[in-house]
Amino acid sequence: MKRFVLPGVAASVVVAVSLGTAGSASAQSAFQCEPGETYIMNVMVSGHPYWVPVYQGFKQAAEAMGCETVFSGTPDYDITKQIASFEQDLVKAPAGILLHPMQSDPFIEPINRAIENGVEIVTFAADSPKSNRTAYITSDNVAEATFAAEEIVAQVGESGQYAVLENPGQSNHDLRVTALIDYMEANYPDMELVGRQATNQDSNAAYRATASILQANPELDALWIPEAGSAEGAVAAVLEADADVLIMHADVTPTTLEHIKAGNIHMALNPNQGMQGFMGFMTAFLAAHPDMIDPFNDYQISGYNPMQIPFIDNGFAVITQENADAFDLNAYMEGRDPS
């Protein structure tokens, strides 16, 4: 399996882990939770399979340190309902929350208020960069888009037509789309963007949008989708039209995995979900225990949390027919606690 991660970030993580190991004999107790110390993972569309490996990684780190965890959020794709679930989490007074904000700006005030009241917030997979969140864990969305653009050109040539589906308002999805378009314009000007429609992770909307794009552009060569829900509908439309369109998307679901195995989807770029959850917990724990570090900066004067980590790249995997079996969620969950 191919993995992609920023060298600088990878090195810093390795150094951090090495230092933690070296000092474990003398400071082991510092990496343990107090009885009842709880961390929450909050998401939208809580039934989506993407969260399963993330929460497993979150729990693995927590269990190693004697901490308690809760999986929370809303089953709906609704920013108001997610914020309401976040507010309910705050009432429980957890030590920290690993948050996937559906939209960036609506979460600024709730995040800042949570931190002011002593609950540390780390974001993952999507961000609220204007908030005071302590850390952000994600795959490099620009690297994903660049990889996708180069793969599309490698398969269809430097001259052709492509389209994108999108999910406006979610930071990681926005970046996956805009970065690919910008890269194509800068490096492959003969690749023409002929369709761009918002489908908002809705497979039915994606089916209709893709059918419309195909009808208007029968010579379409490739389709890039920033998430897996829309890919489910898009591939159905392409198959129904019997069109020869190369499909690439980010993330993966059991449905799109089967289409990859069947050759209907060329490949998927999937964030390293387990590492996302594991590092998400670690950064939330460290944010809640800032006394564990005395860095060489002005944190004592400025008053900010010294555990600030603006960005950690958890890397991404390329899923193809050859390695698709390794991403079978049912196989992964065998023997694991799903709660």
What residue ranges belong to the model's regions?
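Short, solvent-exposed amphipathic alpha-helices that sit
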Residues: 50-65, 144-148, 172-191, 205, ...
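Hydrophobic alpha-helical
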Residues: 96-116, 180, 199-259
